[in-house]
From Swiss-Prot:
ATP binds at G152, G153, A154, G155, V156, G157, K158, T159. It is found in: Cell inner membrane. The keyword Cell inner membrane applies. F-type ATPases have 2 components, CF(1) - the catalytic core - and CF(0) - the membrane proton channel. CF(1) has five subunits: alpha(3), beta(3), gamma(1), delta(1), epsilon(1). CF(0) has three main subunits: a(1), b(2) and c(9-12). The alpha and beta chains form an alternating ring which encloses part of the gamma chain. CF(1) is attached to CF(0) by a central stalk formed by the gamma and epsilon chains, while a peripheral stalk is formed by the delta and b chains. The gene is atpD. Its EC number is 7.1.2.2. One of its GO terms (cellular component) is plasma membrane. Belongs to the ATPase alpha/beta chains family. Produces ATP from ADP in the presence of a proton gradient across the membrane. The catalytic sites are hosted primarily by the beta subunits. This is ATP synthase subunit beta.
Length: 466
């Protein structure tokens, strides 16, 4: 099953076989020498060109390839290691460990292209996924097996939220996480690894990186590498897994780069004509089955802040919840800097989460919205010109804003204050009390960077005594 290279077009390689035609998605191997150094390269068949010729996408740099070099067909797809052994390790797109530790000897390998769960296998229950982060659980709750878009610019705390979620899943739900860095900056991937090591969550997460400097094939397929590892924990171990993709925009972008080289005519804004289908292929595999679930959190970069751009627009159709991070909130020193009015969730309805939760959440949003509307008046005339009713709303809104902040476990190293996991019950109890005016007598500083309402009362007491 040997062939030879007949053409190299950047990351796309055409190969001719004599009597064998490899299937679409089959892996091909090339071993070659560059300046006296032995190199191996994996290709993946993307198109049949007629005759016994195929067009394949390279999973690494193609420097040093020449025509007539020997190519071996594997007879199977790219396969990656799965199982407990992948935890705490970093992998590239073809499942090789790249963390300079001992090479992994996997007991199990799975192909990266797999069918999405069928209708019969999918779970139809909608269950809330408790994160222990007050602002998310109250105002934009995640659902088990749901998909969440994490929107935010640089430096507002996307990575910290991702790490806290990994921590809480590991320690409260006893679950595992998989992180796929799709078109990541190498520096960010490196930082994440060491921050997780310091935060003590590394042994509960598998990391897969296809960095920004790699060819589009590697950046595109790395999402499937990570997803395959997550599917093993869901299907074979019956676990609820958390899957992080950073950044889903770059998955679409790498697809566009490959599409042009494969000779497809581009569609709107230069994207691949198959954009919606490719996005669906990835997203449909992220689902809850009767065994377990994969809940995914996907960072979404929005090019030029244009939400109608085809790439982010193709993601929106699949999302169940959005968590929007706001720089203005971060500047106030409120972390996590989640925007309570911009973040949304499909399950925020009385049928899904119950009347009580729904009433408290909408009550909180109304108070915050009213405060936002009053800010212009406050800026021009000052607080004293407001009616007594409005003054009360402003006071409560400021307490709510402060109470939406929370110390994180993974930030303990930097802040010195111990992290807090707040159950949904405690969250609802605290915010209901603020809405009902139970805590109108407590100074707003007592609400800042604490967990449950119990801690607010203790903090207020110690502030009074001191």
């Amino acid at each position: 099953m040997e062939g030879k290279i007949i053409q190299v077009l950047g990351p796309v390689v055409d190969v001719e076989f004599e009597s064998y035609l490899p299937a679409i998605f089959e892996a091909l191997d090339i071993n070659f020498e560059v300046n006296g150094v032995q190199k191996s390269l994996v290709l993946e068949v993307a198109a049949h060109l007629g005759g016994n010729r195929v067009r394949a996408i390279a999973m690494d740099m193609t420097e040093g390839l020449v025509r007539n070099q020997v190519v071996k067909a594997r007879g199977k797809m790219i396969e990656v290691p799965v199982g407990e052994g992948v935890l705490g390790r970093i992998f590239n797109v073809v499942g090789e460990s790249i963390d300079n530790l001992e090479p992994l000897k996997p007991s199990l390998i799975w192909p990266i292209h797999r069918k999405a769960p069928s209708f019969e296998q999918q779970s139809t229950k909608t269950e809330m996924f408790e994160t222990g982060i007050k602002v998310i659980d109250l105002l934009a709750p995640y659902s088990k097996g749901g998909k969440v878009g994490l929107f935010g610019g640089a430096g507002v705390g996307k990575t910290v939220i991702i790490m806290e979620l990994i921590h809480n899943v590991a320690y409260k739900h006893n679950g595992y996480s998989v992180f796929a860095g799709v078109g990541e900056r190498t520096r960010e991937g490196n930082d994440l690894y060491f921050e997780m090591k310091e935060g003590g969550v590394l042994d509960k997460v598998a990391l897969c990186y296809g960095q920004m400097n790699e060819p589009p094939g590697a950046r595109n397929r790395i999402a499937f590498t990570g997803l395959t590892m997550a599917e093993y924990f869901r299907d074979e171990k019956g676990l609820d897994v958390l899957m992080f993709i950073d950044n889903i925009f770059r998955y679409a972008q790498s697809g566009a780069e490959m599409s042009a080289l494969l000779g497809r005519i581009p569609s709107a804004v230069g994207y691949q004509p198959t954009l919606a289908g490719e996005m669906g292929k990835l997203q449909e595999r992220i689902a809850s089955t009767k065994n377990g679930s994969i809940t995914s959190v996907q960072a979404v970069y929005v090019p030029a802040d244009d939400l109608t751009d085809p790439a982010p627009a193709s993601v929106f159709a699949h999302l169940d919840a959005t968590t929007v991070l706001n720089r203005k909130i971060a500047e106030k020193g409120i972390y996590p800097a989640v925007d309570p009015l911009d973040s949304t969730s499909r399950i925020l309805s009385p049928q899904m989460i119950g009347e009580k939760h729904y009433e408290i959440a909408t009550g909180i949003q109304q108070v915050l919205q009213k405060y936002k509307d009053l800010q212009d008046i406050i800026a021009i005339l000052g607080l004293d010109e407001l009616s007594e009713e409005d003054k009360k709303i402003v006071e409560r809104a400021r307490k709510i804003e402060k109470f939406l902040s929370q110390p994180f476990f993974v930030a303990e190293v930097f802040t010195g204050s111990p992290g807090k996991y707040v159950t949904l019950q405690e969250t609802l109890e605290g915010f209901r009390g603020i809405l009902e005016g139970k805590y109108d007598h407590i100074p707003e500083n007592a609400f800042y960077m604490v967990g449950s309402i119990q801690e607010v009362l203790e903090k207020a007491k110690s502030m009074k005594n001191s």
